[in-house]
Amino acid sequence: MLRDLGRRVAIAAILSGIILGGMSISLANMPHSPAGGTVKLNHP
């Protein structure tokens, strides 16, 4: 059971990282978004 749990956690972490990375990239590529907002999102 521990292996399955660890695998689920790893997959969830990877998926969340990909989603957050894609969101930050899309926000940075948006022409109408302020640069300060993306910097604040990347560096809280």
Curated annotation (Swiss-Prot):
<dbReference type="Pfam" id="PF17447">
    <property type="entry name" value="YkpC"/>
</dbReference>
<protein>
    <recommendedName>
        <fullName>Uncharacterized protein YkpC</fullName>
    </recommendedName>
</protein>
<keyword id="KW-0732">Signal</keyword>
<feature type="signal peptide">
    <location>
        <begin position="1"/>
        <end position="28"/>
    </location>
</feature>
<dbReference type="InterPro" id="IPR035379">
    <property type="entry name" value="YkpC-like"/>
</dbReference>
